[in-house]
Amino acid sequence: MICCKEKIKYVLHYVKETFKDYSVQYEIFGFFGLLSLILRNVTESYSHILYSYKHHVCFKKVEAYLRGRVIHKYHDVDKIVMYALFPWLGVECINHIHTLWQDHHPCYKDLDGNKSYKPKDEVEWTEAIVDWECARFTKPDKPLNAYDTYLKYYYTSEYTRVIINTLISLGLLNVKTTDAGVVYKVTDKMDYFKYE
């Protein structure tokens, strides 16, 4: 479990890494090289505001469609605020801070740059799976549905049982027991969902 104090240590580490990049850029290319890196980070951050806002709106629509109401009203709003107020940090640093701090992300980047997994009881699985499901509607770089995301990133992890149960409870997965064993089938529930 990562306590608040540990999370702050990680955030400071991510920010320090960004400043280290700035320092290297300044040493190699001088003032204008540093300025170009800062401007690139600011430009990328501002371009991600609309990208993240569209995802936020779609998330609420998908959650209302799957659950009948919106529970996670402020999904990813912290990212939008960081893009607006701290754009010089850059998209990568802001994403690292977001995945560490938010409970709907099962993994984060540790201090050594490796992928670390949060304990399964600390993850908000319903929000995570709705997030995976709606990403395909607003993020061209993330075309997978929730079940395919599970298969690609978490299939052999300790999260399997809780992910499958959440997919079933949201109506995204059907289970059939056959002589050959258990068969999972993705439902057509999202086929009728329209996002505009």
Predicted feature locations:
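Metal-dependent phosphohydrolase cores
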Residues: 2-196
